[in-house]
Amino acid sequence: MISPRMTTNLLPARTISLVSNGGAATASPSSPSVAARPRRPSSGTGRGKVSAITLDDYLPMRSTEVKNRTSTDDITSLRLITAVKTPYLPDGRFDLEAYDSLINMQIEGGAEGVIVGGTTGEGHLMSWDEHIMLIGHTVNCFGSRIKVIGNTGSNSTREAVHATEQGFAVGMHAALHINPYYGKTSTEGMISHFESVLPMGPTIIYNVPSRSAQDIPPEVIVAISGYINMAGVKECIGHERIKHYADKGITIWSGNDDECHDSRWKYGATGVISVTSNLVPGLMHSLMYKGENAVLKEKLLPLMKWLFCQPNPIALNTALAQLGVARPVFRLPYVPLPLEKRAEFVRIVEAIGRENFVGQKETRVLDDDDFVLISRY
């Protein structure tokens, strides 16, 4: 039997006559080659009967209703987007109470959007069920107060399409998409990958070669910039690339906290997608909204450099635990910063002012035994 799933939506419906002769099935000359199970010969004749199989078009499991009524302009206007941390319970499950508190503190501090399940939020350590659940939870609880941008990208186009369909189905306002990593593709392959997800809703493209091991060249961004759902680019290459896109009218967010002030005020960036704003959302809001401020920039630089002394989100996880706003639980392979770096963070908080950081508890240096490392969850 031939399953309709063997066809694609590029093939018209057709009738193919399969004639069994001595148990051997052959397709009619006008039909494409079709693999079919041979029919058993009819009793007493040695010849099978002619059978007709109708192959219907492949029908995608999609609704024609609009799933996302967020306009791209609603996304391109955002100045401060936080790549939010995902906190855990001691058994490794999501700590939704702590997560909700973090989101509320982002809203109160002036963040206009959050990336859910990004690198900072450890989406790569989640199952897709966890990932989509957290996006849906964020939308249901906070979607009227802050834009929810789900990281539904993947190095597999099939996975990216499926996750993005699910993300928009549960209400996310926009999607974040990285280029295919590890199993890298060509420039044309990148364009095709992004074109597969752009029709679904507002989309931010994420260029971070230090993680993906492949730069998204400007010709890829220019090629897809005409799509109505192309919201812009989170760019980690640096100021010159940001200026290149800004000069072309393409919305661009800095992906480097230590460069975001100059990117915003000197090179044309719309704003920043930030890690640092997990800790000091109010100060990051000022950095993006209140004009050039070299004093504030220099004040925050030690914190920004500390946050990236080891691969993100190791330092952020350590910091939030020491501030008392998240449990000191790490999903492996992440482990906390060494003791001297933990002590350095306390000094940085004192220099900037505890009142500028999230949470109300006194900052303290945690001991090694305070941390819980989870390998099964």
Swiss-Prot record:
Any matching Pfam family: DHDPS
One GO cellular component, as annotated: chloroplast
Keyword Lyase tagged: yes
Site note Part of a proton relay during catalysis, residues: T119, Y182
Keywords: Amino-acid biosynthesis, Chloroplast, Diaminopimelate biosynthesis, Lyase, Lysine biosynthesis, Plastid, Schiff base, Transit peptide
Domain of life, per lineage: Eukaryota
Biochemical pathway: Amino-acid biosynthesis; L-lysine biosynthesis via DAP pathway; (S)-tetrahydrodipicolinate from L-aspartate: step 3/4
Family statement drawn from the similarity comment of this UniProt entry: Belongs to the DapA family.
Physiological role: Catalyzes the condensation of (S)-aspartate-beta-semialdehyde [(S)-ASA] and pyruvate to 4-hydroxy-tetrahydrodipicolinate (HTPA).
Protein name: 4-hydroxy-tetrahydrodipicolinate synthase, chloroplastic
